[in-house]
């Protein structure tokens, strides 16, 4: 087989492929053997009709169609390997010549991985904040811990208070008509958390189990259903159960109950350390992303529309899959969020293109710098993943190999190394902050 590649646009090539007549004869025979098994030809058992008889009965075209379904994908993959192109879209195939006894001639157009012209990616200047944690942040985290380990006690007698966990049914109407997102049954609500709006929870205080109350509500402007946002509604609420938190005292006994520490002081120190580590990770992420953006800004790269389209589909699926899994249709989701599928695509598309630019630039830096993922590094990453998924590392490797996903791990390692290189060669300006970035 002969194959050549010609650049016809910035990120698009045309493959010219010539397949030997003998190979065409071979796939035509394979097509005949496959189709004749299902053929119903008078006077012959299935699979026994000679090829000339089959062709007279079904026509040669049926053989050619079946043969090309086998030949084109194989020829395309071989041409890609022979020419060394990196396709990023589905191929568009034009059969130029298809005659028995003559070479098959194909013209195949496909988008390819775009060329990246790097700008300056060393000595970039970036600002990095200093992670600091205030006493009030530590206190807030300990209070969350108290609430997390609080006992919930059912209140048989008594009324709703701020901080209670109540189960309610509610139905909202506007001018007597129900609206999307305005009703639910057995909804658990923590009173005071601003279930719908901050002033709404105040109307729940004082209600008793079994009581129904009509509560007027000005629907917030940021309500998901934009058709009713800002309008006046009437919410009919029935309280079905009241539970109240019993908080433990914040002392050494509490520290022993919720941690491995014997004293509140030790628990407080550990809490501060965790908050500092989280702040450091966030600041590190922001700094690394800023460096990537700087490197992209200095580079020249044009992402093919086909690549953006594919990434856009992936990002759309990531948004919609959880919605559908929860039983909501796409149509209801778009109505609830006051958008259309087209407007959502338009919003996401720039992010899809930007994410691809970042990957292409970082991949090019890794290539220029000769960065690779060693097998030891791949094994270490597999060990982390295996621990997370509670699998044996060898079993995880087997699964990833079956899915052809091991290369994605190698790519991720190389990209991390490329960003590490940006950081190592950057001019990092520290900026004091009184509190950790939130």
Swiss-Prot record:
Main location (coarse class): cytoplasm
GO biological process terms held by the UniProt record: 'de novo' cotranslational protein folding; cell division; chaperone-mediated protein folding; protein transport; protein unfolding
InterPro entries reported for this sequence: PPIase_dom_sf, PPIase_FKBP_dom, Trig_fac, Trigger_fac_C, Trigger_fac_C_sf, Trigger_fac_ribosome-bd_bac, Trigger_fac_ribosome-bd_sf, Trigger_fact/SurA_dom_sf
Record key words, sorted: Cell cycle, Cell division, Chaperone, Cytoplasm, Isomerase, Rotamase
Catalytic reaction annotation: [protein]-peptidylproline (omega=180) = [protein]-peptidylproline (omega=0)
GO CC annotation terms, alphabetical: cytoplasm
Lineage: superkingdom: Bacteria
One Gene Ontology MF term: protein folding chaperone
Cysteine disulfide links: none
Subcellular location: Cytoplasm
Domain PPIase FKBP-type per the UniProt entry, residue ranges: 163-248
EC number in record: 5.2.1.8
Chain's role: Involved in protein export. Acts as a chaperone by maintaining the newly synthesized protein in an open conformation. Functions as a peptidyl-prolyl cis-trans isomerase.
Domain characteristics, as noted in the entry: Consists of 3 domains; the N-terminus binds the ribosome, the middle domain has PPIase activity, while the C-terminus has intrinsic chaperone activity on its own.
Alphabetical list of PANTHER family matching this protein: TRIGGER FACTOR CHAPERONE AND PEPTIDYL-PROLYL CIS/TRANS ISOMERASE, TRIGGER FACTOR-LIKE PROTEIN TIG, CHLOROPLASTIC
Family indicated by similarity: Belongs to the FKBP-type PPIase family. Tig subfamily.
Full protein name: Trigger factor
Originating organism: Desulforudis audaxviator (strain MP104C)
């Amino acid at each position: 087989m002969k194959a050549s590649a010609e650049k016809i646009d910035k990120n698009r090539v045309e493959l010219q492929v010539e397949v030997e007549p003998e190979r065409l004869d071979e796939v035509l025979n394979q097509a005949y053997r496959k189709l004749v098994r299902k053929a119903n030809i008078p006077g012959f058992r299935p699979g026994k009709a000679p090829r000339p008889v089959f062709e007279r009965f079904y026509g040669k075209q049926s053989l050619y169609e079946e043969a090309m379904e086998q030949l084109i994908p194989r020829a395309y993959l071989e041409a890609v390997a022979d020419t060394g192109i990196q396709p990023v879209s589905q191929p568009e195939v034009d059969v130029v010549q298809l005659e028995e006894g003559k070479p098959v001639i194909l013209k195949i157009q496909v988008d390819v991985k775009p060329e990246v012209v790097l700008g300056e990616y060393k000595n970039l200047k970036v600002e990095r904040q200093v992670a600091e944690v205030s006493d009030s942040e530590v206190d807030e985290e300990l209070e969350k811990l108290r609430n997390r380990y609080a006992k919930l006690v059912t209140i048989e007698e008594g009324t709703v208070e701020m901080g209670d966990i109540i189960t309610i049914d509610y139905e909202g109407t506007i001018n007597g008509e129900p609206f999307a997102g305005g009703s639910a049954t057995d909804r658990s609500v923590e009173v005071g958390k601003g279930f719908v709006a901050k002033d709404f929870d105040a109307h729940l205080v004082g209600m008793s189990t079994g009581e129904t109350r009509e509560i007027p509500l000005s629907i917030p402007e940021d309500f998901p259903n934009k058709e009713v946002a800002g309008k006046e509604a009437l919410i009919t609420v029935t309280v079905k159960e009241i539970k109240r938190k019993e908080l433990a005292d914040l002392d050494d006994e509490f520290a022993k109950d919720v941690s491995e520490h014997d004293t509140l002081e030790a628990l407080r120190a550990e809490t501060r350390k965790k908050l500092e580590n989280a702040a450091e990770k966030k600041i590190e992420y922001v700094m690394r992303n800023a460096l990537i953006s700087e490197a992209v800004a200095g580079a020249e790269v044009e992402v093919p529309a086909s690549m953006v389209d594919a990434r856009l589909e992936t990002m759309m699926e990531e948004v919609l899959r959880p919605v559908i899994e929860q039983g909501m249709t796409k149509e209801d989701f778009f109505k609830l969020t006051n958008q259309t599928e087209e407007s959502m695509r338009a919003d996401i598309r720039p992010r899809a293109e930007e994410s691809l630019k970042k990957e292409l630039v970082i991949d090019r830096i890794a290539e220029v710098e000769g960065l690779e993922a060693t097998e030891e590094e791949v094994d270490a990453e597999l060990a982390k993943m295996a621990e997370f998924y509670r699998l044996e590392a060898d079993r995880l490797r087997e699964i990833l190999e079956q899915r052809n996903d091991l290369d994605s791990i190698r790519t991720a390692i190389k990209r991390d190394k490329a960003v590490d290189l940006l950081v190592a060669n950057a001019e990092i300006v520290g900026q004091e902050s009184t509190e950790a970035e939130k």
